[in-house]
């Protein structure tokens, strides 16, 4: 079984990769760049 800290880092990295584009779109919408 892998280390709990390693699992947490993998999950956080996965969340950042999957939610990254959505966050960028939200910031662009707030600034009115779209």
Swiss-Prot record:
Function: A core subunit of photosystem II (PSII), probably helps stabilize the reaction center.
Source organism of this protein record: Rhodomonas salina (Cryptomonas salina)
GO biological process, one term: photosynthesis
Assembly and interaction partners: PSII is composed of 1 copy each of membrane proteins PsbA, PsbB, PsbC, PsbD, PsbE, PsbF, PsbH, PsbI, PsbJ, PsbK, PsbL, PsbM, PsbT, PsbX, PsbY, PsbZ, Psb30/Ycf12, peripheral proteins of the oxygen-evolving complex and a large number of cofactors. It forms dimeric complexes.
InterPro entries (alphabetical): PSII_Ycf12_core-subunit (IPR010284)
Keywords: Chloroplast, Membrane, Photosynthesis, Photosystem II, Plastid, Thylakoid, Transmembrane, Transmembrane helix
Official protein name in the record: Photosystem II reaction center protein Psb30
Any one Gene Ontology cellular component term annotated for this protein: chloroplast thylakoid membrane
Membrane topology (UniProt): Single-pass membrane protein
Presence of the UniProt keyword Plastid in the record: yes
Cellular localization per UniProt: Plastid, Chloroplast thylakoid membrane
Transmembrane regions listed in the UniProt entry: 7-27
Primary location class: plastid
Family from the record: Belongs to the Psb30/Ycf12 family.
